Amino acid sequence: MNKPLRGHHNKANTMEIRQHLSQVDLFKGLTVEQLDAIARIVSEKKYKRGQLIFSDGDEGTGFYLVIKGRVKIYKLSPDGKEQIMHIFGPGQPFAEVPVFEGSRYPANAETMDSCELYFFPKKGFVSLIQENPSLAMNMLASLSQRLKQFSHLIEILSLKEVPGRLASYLLYLSD
């Protein structure tokens, strides 16, 4: 039940999208005009619980922002064991790396609840970044924060005993 609007937004819809964007760290400090330019490239997508958004190895065509619901990012081992890498909730972007790297999605993304997502196509978003250095700086800060979280998680999982690792990992997933 994927329902993209492909960037054709009426004025009221653009205002609603702008309102959501203005509350996200990634877009903080941008002008109304910049937010409207971003809103014009956004596609709104709705997914049911348990629906796959993309698979490990799919072409990285853009990134997403969670508006409602939760999305898990995970890898599957050859024997089918699932390793959750991250859980994203409202206001959190995900799958940004392929936009800049020109690569494929490095993991699977699946909805944990009914979800509303905004999709930012790679080509349109890269053009906006080239025109708006402040957007590029916000994106860099967002990716740096995520790198810091993963670094902390690796430290926790590799340096603690099993009960401590489990407790720390459960706390990490609850954030």
Question: Which stretches of residues belong to each language-model region?
Answer:
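Cyclic nucleotide-binding regulatory module and flanking cytosolic helices
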Residues: 2-49, 93, 98-99
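Alpha-helix N-cap/helix-start motif at coil-to-helix transitions, marked by capping-box chemistry
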Residues: 11, 29-32, 36, 64, ...
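Residue-level recognition of specific faces of alpha-helices
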Residues: 20-26, 37, 62-65, 84-87, ...
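Cyclic nucleotide-binding regulatory domains
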Residues: 26, 51-114
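Histidine kinase transmitter module recognition
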Residues: 27, 45, 76, 97, ...
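Polybasic "coupling" helices that flank or enter modular domains
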Residues: 112, 130-175
